A protein has these predicted regions:
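Cationic, amphipathic, low-complexity segments that mediate targeting or membrane/lipid association
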Residues: 1-4, 8-26
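Short linear sequence motifs
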Residues: 3-4, 9-11, 31, 56, ...
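Conserved N-terminal beta1-alpha1 strand-loop-helix module at the mouth
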Residues: 44-213, 217-218, 222-273
């Protein structure tokens, strides 16, 4: 494992000042070569200057180990997601989630992805794990989402799984209903009969409403290879607030790939230059 120190550089009154911001950042096995190491440092430093101009929020979801979380937060993601749905290969139990949440730096949002969770289980979860937002990703109704989120005093977002017969109008109707019950945003993901998410498949982005009363976060099939093309589409960019990716940055289910996380963020930053 390679460890190093990264310094933030400030310029004030004709002088440079160096402030240490990360110490002994681990680089996992996928980032052993010097070029990759230098690249990840450059991207982190580049994010310091690009972040204020890049208004597109980025969430990496489905973390199961601290090393992957360290890499993601160093790359400048806005939010990280932990999955509390046992059938998922990205599932983490309460003890693991508690440990992971303590490694996330300030100002990075921690999102709890739950699927049809009971209130007592959610209450226990939020008492033990430091979480910022609840992401309801199952069959929860707007009323159910509001009740559960209020019980634990958390903001919430809802995943809308887009079906083949959905239209922009039908999706907008769902968004309006979730807004009326207090949602902070919606994630548009691809519908599947066999899973509640993480399928790696795209849906028809032409179905995304033009004018949503809630922020829309795009998910479903995003990868480092296609995110640049997606974000170069100005009509699409006008509709979405951010992107949410899980499988597209993995080397196997539940295990993130440092190179793919780096490539995803690098391609986003290239679009916004």
């Amino acid at each position: 494992m390679i460890s190093f120190v990264i310094f933030n550089i400030f310029y004030e009154n004709n002088k440079f000042f160096f402030g240490k911001i990360w110490t002994c950042l681990p680089i996992n096995d996928t980032l052993k070569c010097d070029n990759a190491t230098y690249s990840i440092i450059l991207v982190i430093l580049d994010n310091m200057t690009q972040k204020s101009f890049n208004q597109l929020a980025v969430k990496f979801c489905g973390f199961t180990c601290a090393d992957d979380l360290h890499t993601a937060t160093a790359l400048g993601v806005d939010a990280v997601g932990l999955v509390f749905y046992p059938p998922s290969p990205r599932f983490v139990d309460v003890d693991t989630a508690k440990m992971l949440s303590l490694t996330v730096p300030a100002f990075t949002t921690i999102v709890a992805l739950v699927v049809n969770m009971e209130q007592d289980e959610l209450t226990n979860l939020t008492k033990q794990v430091s979480l910022d937002i609840i992401q309801f990703h199952g069959d929860e109704t707007p009323a159910r989402c509001q009740k559960l989120a209020s019980a634990v005093n958390k903001r919430w977002i809802k995943a809308i799984r887009v079906k083949h017969n959905d239209t922009a109008a039908s999706i907008l109707n769902q968004i309006n209903e979730f807004k009326s019950w207090g949602a902070s945003g919606v994630i548009l993901d691809t519908f599947s009969d066999s899973a509640y998410g993480g399928t790696g498949h795209l849906f028809d982005w032409n179905k995304i409403p033009n004018h949503s009363p809630l922020p829309i976060y795009l998910a479903g099939g995003l990868t480092p290879d296609n995110v640049g093309d997606i974000l170069s589409n100005q009509s699409l960019m006008a509709k979405i607030k951010g992107v949410d990716v899980s499988g597209g940055i993995e080397k196997e289910k539940g295990v993130k790939c440092g190179r793919r996380m780096w490539a995803f963020m690098n391609n986003i930053n290239n679009v916004h230059r």
